[in-house]
UniProtKB/Swiss-Prot annotation:
Domain of life (superkingdom): Eukaryota
Entry protein name: Photosystem II reaction center protein Psb30
Predominant location: plastid
Membrane topology: Single-pass membrane protein
Pfam families, sorted: PSII_Ycf12
Organism, scientific name: Zygnema circumcarinatum
UniProt key word Transferase: no
GO cellular component terms, semicolon-separated: chloroplast thylakoid membrane; photosystem II
BP terms from Gene Ontology: photosynthesis
Length: 33
């Protein structure tokens, strides 16, 4: 695999994982679960 492909997959994985985490943190801060 090319480094470019690995980098793109890594970025996509980080976005997919960080999305729900950010929403969860915002929900916890607001106290709305």
């Amino acid at each position: 695999m090319n480094l470019e492909v690995v980098a793109q997959l890594t970025v996509l994985a980080l976005i997919v994982v960080s999305g729900p985490l950010v929403i969860g943190l915002l929900a916890l801060r607001k106290g709305n679960l």
